[in-house]
């Protein structure tokens, strides 16, 4: 599966920003408006992935192929989280599910193959 940057990503911001597990994973990020930060970073990530499709790393979870997309929330340069997305059944958009630490994302991606992307390292 190759990421299509022209498709919209529907994000479950409430789940991502109110879920205890996600908040724990993002505890080092200091920002008063995480929703705005996340929205801006998702737009930046889409531009980066459109320039280099290998940044979108596949993972297999709950009988589906999903993509892990790098998010650089702390400094805007170094990935510190992975956004999990899957293509909708209609194929018209991606559904953003959650954010994972890089360690969890790497372990999930390894179930398919060793990730070729240089942002997702153990």
What is the predicted function of each stretch?
Residues 64-122:
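Compact beta-sheet-dominated globular domain cores
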């Amino acid at each position: 599966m190759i990421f299509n940057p022209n498709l919209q990503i529907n994000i479950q911001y409430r789940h991502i920003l109110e879920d205890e597990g996600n908040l724990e994973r993002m505890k080092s990020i200091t920002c008063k408006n995480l929703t705005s930060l996340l929205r801006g970073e998702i737009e930046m990530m889409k531009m980066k992935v459109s320039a280099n499709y290998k940044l979108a790393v596949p993972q297999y979870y709950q009988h589906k192929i999903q993509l892990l997309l790098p998010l650089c929330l702390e400094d805007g340069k170094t990935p510190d989280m992975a956004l999990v997305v899957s293509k909708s059944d209609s194929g018209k958009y991606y559904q953003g599910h959650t954010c994972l630490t890089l360690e969890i994302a790497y372990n999930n991606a390894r179930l398919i193959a060793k990730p070729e992307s240089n942002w997702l390292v153990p």
